[in-house]
């Protein structure tokens, strides 16, 4: 392996992504559902963005946050899936060193952004149900833009330090990553130096971002639940629960596989590698596919516009 020398570290020219170790003979076939899922994610999210853009009645906080979620999903899935499919179908296992670090940055930064957008959507739900008459005055377009900017900057700035730290570390001769994409902890395992600070920083970022967002989401839904239970009729309560169920499904689809993958990397040494890697792939693939489907089905305005578009009645 050829090493490139820098001022303070030596790094390999490239890494080798192994894909899914243990399922090498099945990777050709695994790629087909992965490709279909990615295609649905791309088409679904682009359709969602198009519908929100052209329909001015959808220029409200909920749909603006949904547009942010769609953009994040496109970036997140596109940062891993094309390379993953190239590995499975064309055995293109090599990834350049800097491309690997860029992938690490995009995966973790936009995972943070996605979590932040879901938190902002929970706040929107809370204001809409608990303060319906003041919703438009509280969540003005400028407030929505500021929230989106804060969420974006948090993801970019919070993740940058541990990506920078990895770039300054010396790497061992071993260059194989038992994964289908570059992940922070997987890359750290190839470093020939003390990685405790970088590991600690990664833990801090993950727990501070996910912990804060989940606390805000949890508190929002506690207040929402209290408000819904005070509604006079059972039909009104059922309708309120039904309208928020899509957001809860999206939250669970992101956090369950993401937390499983994150905790398994650090503490789940007894979990089979195949199971861990499959979950690590799914958390970057399933939410981007499900989000436009869930919101397209559960949100009447979006569903109607998509149907009109399919019938040729949409500009």
Curated annotation (Swiss-Prot):
GO terms for cellular component: plasma membrane. Its main location: membrane. Coiled coil: none annotated. Disulfide bonds join 100-192. Residues 50-57, 124-142, 221-240, 298-315 are cytoplasmic. Residues 1-28, 79-102, 164-199, 262-276 are extracellular. Pfam families: 7tm_4. Glycans are attached at residue 7. It comes from the Eukaryota. The chain crosses the membrane at residues 29-49, 58-78, 103-123, 143-163, 200-220, 241-261, 277-297. PROSITE patterns: G_PROTEIN_RECEP_F1_2. It is a multi-pass membrane protein. SUPFAM superfamilies: Family A G protein-coupled receptor-like. Keywords: Cell membrane, Disulfide bond, G-protein coupled receptor, Glycoprotein, Membrane, Olfaction, Receptor, Sensory transduction, Transducer, Transmembrane, Transmembrane helix. One of its GO terms (molecular function) is olfactory receptor activity. It is found in: Cell membrane. Belongs to the G-protein coupled receptor 1 family. Odorant receptor. This is Olfactory receptor 52R1. It comes from Homo sapiens.
